[in-house]
Amino acid sequence: MPAVIDKPKKYGVKAPLPGVIVDVKVKPGDEIKRGDTVVILDAMKMENNITSDRAGKIAEICVAPGESVMEGKDLVILE
């Protein structure tokens, strides 16, 4: 019987509202804690710190500064 290999569970930090990415505060491989800012999002002429609601390691960055995003889009992926 072949060995079963568990794939790491991945979790996306999503945009809570539509806006434009101002800055990405993390890079792939960074270890973050719950509450750490991952992205700054400009929405309705206000800059919003988008934080992670769990700890993990950054697996992927899904956005870049200047990019417009819709509510619910993955900003970063944690593993």
Task: Describe each model-derived feature in a short phrase.
Residues 1-3:
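Flexible, non-catalytic peripheral segments of proteins
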Residues 5-79:
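Structured functional modules or segments
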